[in-house]
């Protein structure tokens, strides 16, 4: 059955090791493969309704007063669509990560987080197409991606595919960017200092769903894990 083929779109916020932001978020959105086209068309129709160019990328960084109507309606669409699920892992302080102790680098850690992100919801009777936002084409990055796929495959009877794509080619990848951006924004406590009222409205709209963005949320629609590193 085509409902048993699941597309998963993964991305991150503030994952670079040496950037100023200490909070890292890795997140994904998923839905049945046979719903991708209709959902994408719905999002494009929303853009048209709000006079946004159909090829304009949806991003958390683009949330503004002039576009608040679109982003609030997009958020409502996500919560009302029964086929969409979101999950995020928040690393509150990546500066505390001790990579040498675990014989890894930061890029390896990123793919470990992708594994933790997806392994949580794997079902034996489903196959998965996993798309990660394209960051780099290095040999090591490709190796880590293939290893991640292999580890996930060990927990699933059906085939798992994993590849990189660019976000501008996928409405669902862009929707994930929007939601994970909200999670990262809140966990960086920027909601306490921002002058961007539109972003505050998005945060408040999420909170009306009884979702707490800086605590573990075992929520079927909007799942959050606050990740704490093991000590060595």
Residue ranges and their predicted role:
Residues 1-232:
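Phosphate-ester processing/binding pockets and catalytic centers
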């Amino acid at each position: 059955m085509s409902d048993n083929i699941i597309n998963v779109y993964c991305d991150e916020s503030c994952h670079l090791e040496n950037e100023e932001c200490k909070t890292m978020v890795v997140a994904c959105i998923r839905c049945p493969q046979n719903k991708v086209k209709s959902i994408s068309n719905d999002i494009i129709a929303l853009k048209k309704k709000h006079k946004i160019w159909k090829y304009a990328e949806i991003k958390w960084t683009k949330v503004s007063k002039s576009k608040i109507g679109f982003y609030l309606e997009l958020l409502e669409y996500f919560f009302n669509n029964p086929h969409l699920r979101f999950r995020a892992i928040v690393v509150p302080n990546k500066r505390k990560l001790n990579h040498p102790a675990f014989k890894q680098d930061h890029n390896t850690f990123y793919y470990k987080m992708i594994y933790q992100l997806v392994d949580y919801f794997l079902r034996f009777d489903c196959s998965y197409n996993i798309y990660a936002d394209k960051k780099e084409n290095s040999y090591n990055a490709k190796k880590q991606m293939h290893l991640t796929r292999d580890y996930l495959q060990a927990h699933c009877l059906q085939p798992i595919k994993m590849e990189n794509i660019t976000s501008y080619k996928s409405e669902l990848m862009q929707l994930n960017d929007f939601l994970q951006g909200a999670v990262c924004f809140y966990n960086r406590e920027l909601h306490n200092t921002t002058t961007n009222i539109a972003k505050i409205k998005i945060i408040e709209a999420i909170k009306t769903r009884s979702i707490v963005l800086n605590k573990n949320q075992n929520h079927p629609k909007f799942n959050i894990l606050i990740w704490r590193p093991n000590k060595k």
